[in-house]
């Protein structure tokens, strides 16, 4: 049947049913929640049940466990995650039924068409920067829509449909999908060698993709670039768009001065383009988070948020799930009292930044790291860098690599990484074959007063939550 748009009066009623394949993913669940709020009938499937799928179900989405061709029957559009294989039965059925199929980034681009888009790109820091920007705009009364790759703790969600005209979202460079977006404002936090498997193992193609991302801005758009990052700084001089820079460099348009760490917080003076200076206490540790906050401040300044309002938003920021998330203290069976911090960091540069933040905030504590490498390809490509940064901690426990769908690569597993770290002569890493064994092994490594960092982009976060809830007893995977 051919549906006439004028018969329904709006597009939601004309094409109300949207199905998400891989609805539990961080990027997918956020878009699904926004579309639910817009009035769409949302369904979705995923192989795993998680907090995101449970939240969506409570909000009214129909969520199915596992993938089946029957799940897409009657739907008007199928949204697919980049993690989904082409032979997925739901995609195959959608093709046979000629149901429109949209990649996740394409649907985000559709949402952005109805708002003024702010897209935050960069190899590291996207989630934190996007979250801080949403907090600044909210504090400034702009009521933004946001779609974030992590849970904004103050909102209890990774997405929200706001009543204002601005939409702030992460722009994912990992698979090149950020090139589908057409924002009014684009942020680049940094450019690093990661996800090279999607760029023909050629870093020059990564650099070119970021340059093309800025080309997608309209002629009146704005590029907000972190010139403390050499790759971004090089891009700034070649970008044929309006540019505002941020960083700690003296020539940055928006910069931080007199930066000091005070426990889990950072204190600095925010200097804005008009010459205005404002003292800021940022509710996050680490110099890398100061840079993330500067990007949010630059966005706020551009949209007319007052400097004291920007400072208040940064001071009251409640954090993001799995981004230096201080879970509290727990006691081992031997009586050792340790503080547990959960973090998503999974690239050597991210590990280095988090370690620096931990040492800056708790200089008297031993730094114990439980790390789950993410992807065999990343472990191979960054092998020496991983060995170098992981050899700097006081004690280390490695679980096996979280494959994320990849087949094992010889010489790119945790045991090979442990041997490389051991050869440096600074630490004696402990290796556990399965992530479920971490909780049992850690008490043998920990001492009273330690700071335990549990890091990785796989499922190590569930172990951290298990330890806080149940102590150091066996985790059931």
From Swiss-Prot:
Its EC number is 6.3.2.8. GO terms for molecular function: ATP binding; UDP-N-acetylmuramate-L-alanine ligase activity. The keyword Glycoprotein does not apply. ATP binds at residues 122-128. It catalyses: UDP-N-acetyl-alpha-D-muramate + L-alanine + ATP = UDP-N-acetyl-alpha-D-muramoyl-L-alanine + ADP + phosphate + H(+). Pfam families: Mur_ligase, Mur_ligase_C, Mur_ligase_M. It is found in: Cytoplasm. Pathway: Cell wall biogenesis; peptidoglycan biosynthesis. One of its GO terms (cellular component) is cytoplasm. InterPro entries: Mur-like_cat_sf, Mur_ligase_C, Mur_ligase_C_dom_sf, Mur_ligase_cen, Mur_ligase_N, MurCDEF_pg_biosynth, UDP-N-AcMur_Ala_ligase_MurC. GO terms for biological process: cell division; cell wall organization; peptidoglycan biosynthetic process; regulation of cell shape. It is an enzyme of class 6 (ligase). The keyword Nucleotide-binding applies. Keywords: ATP-binding, Cell cycle, Cell division, Cell shape, Cell wall biogenesis/degradation, Cytoplasm, Ligase, Nucleotide-binding, Peptidoglycan synthesis. PANTHER family: UDP-N-ACETYLMURAMATE--L-ALANINE LIGASE, UDP-N-ACETYLMURAMATE--L-ALANINE LIGASE-RELATED. Cell wall formation. This is UDP-N-acetylmuramate--L-alanine ligase. It comes from Xanthomonas euvesicatoria pv. vesicatoria (strain 85-10).
